[in-house]
Amino acid sequence: MIAQRPRPDRGWLVTVVAAAAVGLGGVLMLRGVVLRALSGGAGRLSPGAGLAAGTGALLLLVVVGLATPTVLGGLIALRRHRLEARGRPYPPRQRREWKPGLAVRAVHGGIRSAGAILSGRPRRRALFPFDLVEVCSLEEILKTLDPRGTLDALPFMPEMAAYCGEEHRVLRRVDKINDYVTGSGLRRMRDTVLLERLRCDGQHHGGCQTCCHLLWKEAWLKRTSGNGRSFAEPDGPPLPGSCDPAFREGDLQRLVTRVEGYRGVQYVCQMTEVARASARLSWNDPRHYLRDLLLGNVRLGPFVVGVSIEMFNRVQKRFGSGVLYPQLATTGLATSPHQVLDLQPGDVVRVRAKHEIERTLTAGYRNRGLWFDTEMLRFCGGEYRVSARVDRLIEEKSGQLITVGNPCIILDGVTACGEYKVFCPQNESILWREIWLERVSPAPRDEPRLTLQ
């Protein structure tokens, strides 16, 4: 039974009203300062009075600027909370990315060129969402790898070789990533992108079925016009750490596993190497937000929504009731219930309502060890097709292949959007317990397997 607690939306409404009052008061005071300055005449104000008026106006602008997203974030939280209570989904209606124009590309190219000169390391022109690229030949890619089969500590995996020579579009840039291996949080990545629909099939990693989105270094890609012509860039000096030319495709397979003492065989993949392939990044550093907005990863609308919710939560935590959005309740039980639906790819299912899922969660927001993340709430009440069953996966911290006793389900087109995780671009597949789903209709015979974006 879910423990009873005060309704969070009441505290949220108080914060919205208070922030709106502060913002309105700031607007009225700012209007008064401006009118007084205009009526008095600029020449009649002493330097001290002018400085005080200017400082006051600036402070009022800051107050209004902080109050506005707080109110907007609170209203979004209240609306979504009502939808969750009614079991109605609110998934993203369109892609969050946009295509940067020539001006953005030129400015970013200049900054990148300056960085290359200062660091002494050649860097290609950046890739952006919607760019059409061709994956370099395997021979070209192998020349960029060090003896560990990595570039900037990011492995090129054998599963990626199948796409060499193919044309694909860039989904988004990966300038930051969440480190779930060491728990160090948000980390900075460079010169890395996702390509549309290219996910790891786990063929060379023990049949891992988590369908992680493959990470591609820009050095492994080249722009193409779409008519078979690619735009090769000057190679420049060899990349630091480039391996011996004798490095072969078979070496990639050899580097997939390693043996470490009592732990036995451990798999090496891009997700196990996230910490090594990235650098620490402060959550309070605003530059990663600017990169998201200016370089095409997040359109203005989703950006405003995400930042407003974050601002609302910060105000709520410091000045309000402390109850943040989104909220989940749990049963508090030590063990969680289980249900077997034997779902198969192609089955149509409905994600259960929030209050139904809450009854299946232990104190750690888990069911049989699988965490129900707040990113998943937006899909509650929606109908989706099953894309895959997951009963084998690589545990990222240990690198060991695990057979899952309670299979998980991946739904077609249902991925983490990163709105509550500072717009993290990983586009992870979301794993679902069968007890969180209900079958709507079985899969038609001979229906082709669906793929995630």
Predicted feature locations:
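Generic structural signal for buried aliphatic residues
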Residues: D131-V135, G346-V351
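Alpha-helical transmembrane spans of integral membrane proteins, capturing the lipid-embedded, hydrophobic core
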Residues: V16, A20-L24, L58, V62, ...
